[in-house]
Amino acid sequence: MNDLSHTANDALRVSVLSEALPYIQRFAGRRIVIKYGGAAMAHAELRAAVFRDIALLACVGVQPVVVHGGGPEINQWLKRLQIPAEFRDGLRVTDADTMDVVEMVLVGRVNKQIVNGLNQLGARAVGLSGSDGGLVEARPWGDGSHGLVGDVARINPDVLEPLLNKGYVPVISSVAATPSDGRAHNINADTVAGELAASLQAEKLILLTDTPGILRDRNDPESLIRKLRLSEARQLIEDEVVAGGMTPKTECCIRALAQGVAAAHILDGRVPHALLLEVFTDAGIGTMVVGRENHSSEADN
């Protein structure tokens, strides 16, 4: 590589850092809740990129909170243990045997893998389940016909405040107990992330998915909608432009925004460093939904 190439690469790095500076200043000390799952969890290179993004966010003074799922690994263990996997209404039907596997995988394996990966990068991560300290109180989902599938009844943010204020990165698995009988329930990780973001009055809720974001035409990746107001997001659901698996994710964003979260983002976790591209660049990626008109005019991110 010649001197001119070195100079061009150095100039590009300086330009990237310069572009990131106002966002670093804006979000220092702010809380960002990240739902981590999908392809970004399944592939080693993407997993490493997500860990580096989260570690960098913490390094520059942002307070990230990570909520994770782990569906593919749960399925692998169910198959290994010859326990049939059943889904109904998009939810995993969870009997007692399945719940044991869910808890083992999410709390005992996936959570520790994320914590170890972040700690290797100096991020000071702490692993928790929703049950720890009563962080998340569960209630049975619907009429109980899905077994030990839960919904969020209450969030106790006091569990996280000391950790965040001392620079730790909470990593939370979406398993929580019902206070009446202490039984563990499997809760959708998007739901937990959204309710945590609202309870912490987070600046941002970020959902890493396996799609580019909200599409005007779900069969056309080029029809990505980059920015929506809360009212527009509701209208897209009503008009069935948002449908299928994107509906609960969009509804999760809407609930978080309605409770005071400034912005919610649906990003393509298959894109390396999607988190940094969304938070620290002018263009961003994915879809941003904003709940306040003035937030949209303050910044594109």
Curated annotation (Swiss-Prot):
GO terms for molecular function: acetylglutamate kinase activity; ATP binding. GO terms for biological process: arginine biosynthetic process via ornithine; L-arginine biosynthetic process. Its EC number is 2.7.2.8. It comes from the Bacteria. It is found in: Cytoplasm. It catalyses: N-acetyl-L-glutamate + ATP = N-acetyl-L-glutamyl 5-phosphate + ADP. GO terms for cellular component: cytoplasm. Substrate binds at G70, G71, R92, N186. Its main location: cytoplasm. Pathway: Amino-acid biosynthesis; L-arginine biosynthesis; N(2)-acetyl-L-ornithine from L-glutamate: step 2/4. Keywords: Amino-acid biosynthesis, Arginine biosynthesis, ATP-binding, Cytoplasm, Kinase, Nucleotide-binding, Transferase. Gene3D superfamilies: Acetylglutamate kinase-like (3.40.1160.10). InterPro entries: AceGlu_kinase-like_sf, AcgluKinase_fam, ArgB, Asp/Glu/Uridylate_kinase, Glu/AcGlu_kinase, NAGK-C. The record marks K35, K249 as: Transition state stabilizer. Belongs to the acetylglutamate kinase family. ArgB subfamily. HAMAP family: ArgB (MF_00082). Catalyzes the ATP-dependent phosphorylation of N-acetyl-L-glutamate. NCBIfam families: argB. This is Acetylglutamate kinase. It comes from Synechococcus sp. (strain CC9902).
